[in-house]
Amino acid sequence: MTPAVFLVILCLGVVPGASALDLSLDVQWQEWKIKYEKLYSPEEEVLKRVVWEENVKKIELHNRENSLGKNTYTMEINDFADMTDEEFKDMIIGFQLPVHNTEKRLWKRALGSFFPNSWNWRDALPKFVDWRNEGYVTRVRKQGGCSSCWAFPVTGAIEGQMFKKTGKLIPLSVQNLIDCSKPQGNRGCLWGNTYNAFQYVLHNGGLEAEATYPYERKEGVCRYNPKNSSAKITGFVVLPESEDVLMDAVATKGPIATGVHVISSSFRFYQKGVYHEPKCSSYVNHAVLVVGYGFEGNETDGNNYWLIKNSWGKRWGLRGYMKIAKDRNNHCAIASLAQYPTV
């Protein structure tokens, strides 16, 4: 196995032309700036207002279509509303290493023994899983302007497995991964991947807690102290590219680190409902933690979802979470790069 096959993640734009501002949005603009503590220079204010208005109108159109049953989720004006798609991609998402299909096939063969016939066990699995209710999941965090999305699901998956083993839920240090996994191939706040992060924890012999190595939203000098180690792993498992296998793993193992393809024009404004984006592809550019699954309405309605934990703060989505379409041909590549640690 090589890191090149895995998700590389930086962690999530077109500069608008000059246009007249919609004065009817003045009050809403001022309220939004206060809510999200936005401060601009006079020159920047106009540019940001134009972008914000374009996003507001796009969100309003989407939600009108939702009321007519044309889509399955609603969007909202949030912290990212003053950013173009390109600005958002540069800050949160970014670059992906190439995927080598030959090596993917090798992984699938090697991992077959981990999940013998798991795709036939679907009916025996629970209809709903939410590891938050079982104490496996720490609070939602916010990565900010650091492209560190790759680190959050790694700490999240380890936190869950350590809780399963010890009964203690300890928030682990994302900053430890950002500062110290460069020898494994990660690049701090520029980009990284989950494979390299798991490799670091495995070969380093431990990972510090958030309490002793807090998040700084920027890369620093590695200052890992083995005396402060709060978690160790014995290895990690890479799942075959299958939603059935992912379902089995989520139900029987716990929270699973994975990747998704983020369409910045819709994903970043998600509010509620089951996210289904026709423009999604197999191009993975963001990392999340799968903490459960289920369905909305009746099981036969086709509104099955994966419950994912994001790293964009509690003001995004369902207080930091999203329901993304499940059993829809690996929608947004949700099952393509799934991994979990052993402890």
Swiss-Prot record:
It comes from the Eukaryota. This is Cathepsin Q. GO terms for molecular function: cysteine-type endopeptidase activity. GO terms for biological process: proteolysis involved in protein catabolic process. The active site is at residues 149, 286, 310. Transmembrane segments: none annotated. Pfam families: Inhibitor_I29, Peptidase_C1. Residues 21-124 form a propeptide. GO terms for cellular component: extracellular space; lysosome. Highly expressed in placenta. The keyword Membrane does not apply.
